[in-house]
Amino acid sequence: MISPSTIVTVPCFSGSPWYLEQLTPLSDWSLRTMRLPEALDNIEAYADFVAGQVVDLDRYILVGDSFGANIAIALATRHPRGLVALVLSGGFAANPITNPITKLKLTAASFLPGNLYQQITLRFHAQSLASPFDVDGQVPLSQSAIRELFIQNTPRRSYLSRMKAAFSANYLGKLDHIQVPTLILTPAYERLIGKNAAQQLVEGIPNATEVILPNTGHMFRFTHPVTYANAIREFLQDHLVGELITR
């Protein structure tokens, strides 16, 4: 009998560990999270870090959200031992900011130092992440709460380094190296990530399935954790049928 895999979650741009207790539909699995290291400025270095986090696992499912999805893609293209499935939410294989105005604003805001970083840069970033569905989610989330998430978890140096990493990485030519079942979770409402990002993943990864979660935005892992986790659960039950899972 195959032993159950561990679900390993990779943080978003904030670097903050996941709130695993909110993912109640996944309670049958062992869950693991982490905090992203500070100031790394390339995705391969982040992938090296995550590889170190799973070195003790015989079987694992990698779940990456947004910036974390880019990291998960980088690791998955290496054919790492033990990886049995991949989940990417709000993810991208190359520079996700295709709107030139949004990119210009983010770049300009990144030059603001000290208190201006918190007051202006993070305020604009929170606005870019927010959706009309956040305040009515299973866990309501305001723009000020999104901004506070970054204030508490993302030093300016790390913000700038992660921007550099996200803008410079390009895995479009390596997506066909991913040989495990892959779920692409896409929010119904998205302003930050370019609209073609999910399509590129679906078309580039050989065994990919896309699920669009209605009435959700980019922060759906935070605002709709039960809906989000249910989609993952259904995917794993369909694709990892040989696992011993207590229901």
Predicted features by range, described:
Residues I2-L40:
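Conserved HGGG/HGGXW glycine-rich cap/lid loop of the alpha/beta-hydrolase fold
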Residues Q22, Y171, V180, G194-E203:
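Short alpha-helix in the alpha/beta-hydrolase fold that links the catalytic acid
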Residues G64-G68, A72:
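Gly/Ala-rich beta-loop-alpha elbow adjacent to hydrolase catalytic centers
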Residues T77, G82, L86-N115:
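Flexible "cap/lid" loop of the alpha/beta hydrolase fold
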Residues I97-N99, Q118-D176:
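Conserved alpha/beta-hydrolase catalytic His-Asp/Glu region
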Residues I178, I184-T186:
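Short beta-strand/loop motif that positions the catalytic acidic residue
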Residues Y189-I193:
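Acidic catalytic loop of the alpha/beta-hydrolase fold
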Residues T216-A229:
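Catalytic histidine-centered segment of alpha/beta-hydrolase-like enzymes
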